[in-house]
């Protein structure tokens, strides 16, 4: 149907009798969603709306990311490789969306932010329960974080539940063990509240996979999916740190942290260290025995 006079007529089949029926706004509860932006500055600072929406939309994407990562764990528990890869693919796209969102907040100038920063009090993104939940799902376990949520017993209980359960990576290692890979016994059952750190005893497992990709294609593909997730997560962390640096410089954070310096430390935290370390030894014909010192300087 051609458009005449820059006007598009409604088609006969379009529903207009919506009284008492499910609508777009009703399904999405837009009345609640769009009334949740309540600036605290008086008079309301124009740019506080940007700040609120930036963080609210981030929390929505984090909710979806947690949903997908939980599904990935369940799929691994049931050896459902392709279903796991599907939700990991979506997780990567969510992380890209979260990363690109920082470009919107970067339009906030230092003076604009300082115009309403005082109303934030001690509130801080560090207190994002969903962010900590996702870090725990991915393996960055830190029981100290629970202290931050002492004011929220229900939220703290949610965090404790995921703290005490195997992470995505630990479920992946258990999956590998079920399919005949020589995963050390401690990864079958251990204190899951302790963060995973790089372990040289796992390197032979991943050398075998990466040097025999035709034979272990499913395992290799999952490894690369996890590498993609960590890489994108670190890009998000980096953009966060750079955005904070751009807006507030090296001021302390509202939550009491050192600000940029504290965010920089997060860039050294890893989820799946062996999947990066293995690349150093892949294809090397002669490797020193495990634990041998490097004498080549």
Curated annotation (Swiss-Prot):
Cofactor requirement: heme
Entry's family note: Belongs to the tryptophan 2,3-dioxygenase family.
Keyword terms, alphabetized: Dioxygenase, Heme, Iron, Metal-binding, Oxidoreductase, Tryptophan catabolism
Free-text comment on the cofactor: Binds 1 heme group per subunit.
Pathway where it operates: Amino-acid degradation; L-tryptophan degradation via kynurenine pathway; L-kynurenine from L-tryptophan: step 1/2
Purpose of the protein: Heme-dependent dioxygenase that catalyzes the oxidative cleavage of the L-tryptophan (L-Trp) pyrrole ring and converts L-tryptophan to N-formyl-L-kynurenine. Catalyzes the oxidative cleavage of the indole moiety.
Subunit structure of this chain's protein: Homotetramer.
Positions contributing to substrate binding: 51-55, 113, 117, 254
Organism placement in taxonomy: Bacteria, Pseudomonadati, Pseudomonadota, Gammaproteobacteria, Lysobacterales
Pfam families on file: Trp_dioxygenase
Protein's name according to its UniProt entry: Tryptophan 2,3-dioxygenase
Binding site for heme: 240
Single GO BP term: L-tryptophan catabolic process to kynurenine
Catalyzed reactions per annotation: L-tryptophan + O2 = N-formyl-L-kynurenine
Molecular function in Gene Ontology: heme binding; metal ion binding; tryptophan 2,3-dioxygenase activity
EC number, UniProt record: 1.13.11.11
Gene3D superfamilies with a match to the protein in the record: 1.20.58.480
């Amino acid at each position: 149907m051609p458009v005449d006079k820059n006007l598009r007529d409604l088609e006969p089949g379009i529903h207009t009798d919506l009284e008492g029926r499910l609508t777009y706004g009703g399904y999405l509860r837009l009345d609640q969603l769009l009334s949740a932006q309540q600036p605290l500055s008086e008079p309301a600072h124009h740019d506080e709306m940007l700040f609120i929406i930036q963080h609210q939309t981030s929390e929505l994407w984090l909710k979806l990311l947690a949903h997908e990562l939980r599904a990935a764990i369940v799929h691994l528990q049931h050896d459902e490789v392709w279903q796991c890869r599907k939700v990991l693919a979506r997780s990567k796209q969510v992380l890209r969306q979260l990363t690109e969102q920082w470009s919107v907040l970067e339009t906030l100038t230092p003076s604009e932010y300082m115009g309403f920063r005082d109303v934030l009090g001690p509130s801080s993104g560090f207190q994002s329960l969903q962010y900590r939940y996702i870090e725990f799902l991915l393996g960055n376990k830190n029981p100290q974080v629970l202290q931050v949520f002492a004011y929220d017993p229900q939220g703290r209980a949610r965090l404790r539940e995921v703290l005490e359960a195997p992470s995505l990576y630990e479920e992946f290692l258990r999956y590998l063990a079920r399919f005949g890979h020589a995963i050390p016994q401690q990864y079958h059952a251990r204190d899951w509240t302790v963060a995973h750190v790089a372990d040289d005893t796992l390197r032979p497992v991943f050398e075998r996979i990466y040097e025999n990709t035709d034979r272990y294609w499913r395992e290799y593909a999952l490894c690369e999916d996890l590498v993609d997730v960590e890489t994108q997560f670190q890009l998000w962390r980096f953009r966060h740190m750079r955005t904070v640096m751009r807006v507030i410089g090296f001021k302390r954070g509202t939550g009491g942290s050192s600000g940029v310096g504290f965010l920089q430390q997060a860039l050294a935290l890893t989820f799946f260290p062996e999947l990066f370390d293995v690349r150093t030894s892949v294809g090397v014909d002669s490797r020193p025995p495990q634990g041998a010192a490097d004498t080549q300087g």
